[in-house]
Structure formats: C-alpha cells, structure tokens
Amino acid sequence: MKIKIALCQINVVDNKEKNIENATSMILKAVKQNADFIVLPEMFNCPYSNEKFIEYCEEETHSPTLSKIAKLANENNTYILAGSIPEKEGSKIFNTSYLFDKNGEIIAKHQKMHLFDIDVKGKIYFKESDTLSSG
C-alpha cells in the first residue's frame, strides 16, 4: 500500500484570515496532486511570537481555523495534520497539533511538551514558555 504525503510550507503573515486562506490553498493544491495525507506547519495560522500567540489563540470548540480544516478534510476525503495552532484551554495557551480523518473529525491531538526556550546573552532571547504551557 502506498500513501502520498504532502508537506505544506506557508508564509505566515499577521492576518489570521489570510493565513487560513493560504493553508486552504495549499491543501487544495495537495488534493489536486492526489495527496492522501496533508501536513501543515507549526503555527500555520499565527506569526511566531509570544504576543501573537495570545492574540491568535482559539478554543478548540470555537475555532474558525479548526472548523475550516475539518470541512476541507471532509469535503476532500483526506487526512490533514493541522501542524499546530495556539490553543486556549482555560487560562492556558498550548501549541497544539490536530489530526483530522477523512470525515473531518479530530482523531488525535497533541500539545507540545518541550517548549523552545533560548537565551544567548547579547544575541537572541525567545522563550515560548513565557506564554505557552507545556502539554
């Protein structure tokens, strides 16, 4: 049995609706190439910054991003791994990946456990843990 996997690279911008449109376009392009399993990148709907994680976070049950991906999986009869989005759960925000089946149902979910923190004195400082919680 062969499975065709499509890995989508997306230029994320500071506009959630545009990012969802870009993801949709990439998914439909992969579908046209007969992909069985489509993979979106980490934080595909949100610029990669702590401030934006807060601004762009969505609750799983009220998520325009996840609703769109579910619809696309169902309409195109394909599995989609929604790389990750900033997911709000209670007072916490997680970097969460979702796997959708061909019916558009969430069949798996993973909250990132090992957050990316870097502090190189005088060069670079970025700590996901300043905003995100470990799953």
Model-predicted segments: where are they?
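Short, conserved active-site loops that position catalytic residues or coordinate cofactors/metal ions
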Residues: 2, 7-9, 33-56
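Active-site-proximal beta-strand elements of phosphoester/diester hydrolases
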Residues: 2-14, 96, 109-112
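Feature marks short, surface-exposed loop/turn motifs that line or immediately flank catalytic pockets
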Residues: 11-14, 44-47, 114-116
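A short, N-terminal amphipathic alpha-helix
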Residues: 21-37, 66-79
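Active-site beta-loop-alpha substructure in enzyme catalytic cores
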Residues: 29-40, 126-135
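Short glycine-enriched, charge-decorated loop/helix-capping segments at active-site entrances
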Residues: 53-60, 125
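Short, conserved loop-to-beta-strand elements that form functional interface hotspots
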Residues: 77-89
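Active-site catalytic loop in hydrolytic enzyme cores
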Residues: 88-135
